Structures are given as structure tokens and as C-alpha cells.
Amino acid sequence: LEKYGAKLKYILNTHAHFDHVMGEKEAQERTGLPVYVHEDDKILLENLKRQAAFFGIGEAEAPENIKTFDENTVFTLGNQEIKVIHTPGHTPGSVCFLFGDALISGDTLFYGSIGRTDFEGGSFAQISDSIQNKLFKLDENITVYPGHDAQTTIGYEKKYNSPFGKNN
């Protein structure tokens, strides 16, 4: 950010699993910004230390100024709206962020796969519903940027993502 003279406006979370939020306390200290998480995942973020211990990770401190949002929240970045799409299943408060023709999908939708549902609060039925009835209703040309691995498009995933793909 310093290199480009950019200023951070938000610290937004697609969900509150430790592998996505471990550096947020430091980011918050550097920027003074609150951390935003869906209201259904706030407890996960507040209990970051317990999550990290479960996975054998060392010290993990949760951020202090945590703000919640719901599916009706819209963030702005310049003249662009960032829309929240609540996609429970990986966690109860999993969300995707849609802005323009880009979707930040966190751990809900991956290239050829979906997020795990075997952690506490996960639900295969919910993630399936989120993908089929929310994400797959979006324009097929939207580029999906998952929380891990390669980007994809809504159209590609509708066609090929097992068990949802038309070609399976």
C-alpha cells in the first residue's frame, strides 16, 4: 500500500477461519481500521485463539474493534459498490463479495470444488443451497477469486463443478 500511495479502507472477511484472519490484529494496529465480519461469524473471530490451538498453531490474537454486517450491507470503494452475498455452509457467516464482474468467494466456491463443511458450523446442505441458489444465479462471465488456489468463472463452475455441473 505504501509503495503505491494507496490507503486501506476496509478489512473485510469472507469468513472467520484462522487461516484467513491471523494477521488482522496487526493490520488493525497499523491502520486503525475496524475488522468487518458477518454477524454469524463474529464468535469465530472472537475465539481465534481457540481455533489456532485446535490446529496446533501458536499464538493468535483476535482483533479488538470488530464490526458486523449482514447480507443487506453494501460497502463502497470509490464509485463501486461491494455487495455482500451471505453464503453459509463453510461457516455460518460465510459470505462472498461481489463488485462489478468480480466475486471474492472466500472458501465457498473454488475452481472445480467447494469449501469444506466438516468443521464446526459447516453444512453441506447450506453450502449447496448457497452455491446453486445464489452464486449460480449470477452472470456466467463473473470472475471468481477464491480464498485458495486458481480463479475461475461462474459459468465454468455451473458447467463443470461436481456435483453441480451440467456435464457430470
Please place each PLM-identified region on the residue numbering:
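Active-site HxH/HxHxD metal-binding segment of metal-dependent hydrolases
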Residues: 2-76, 159-163
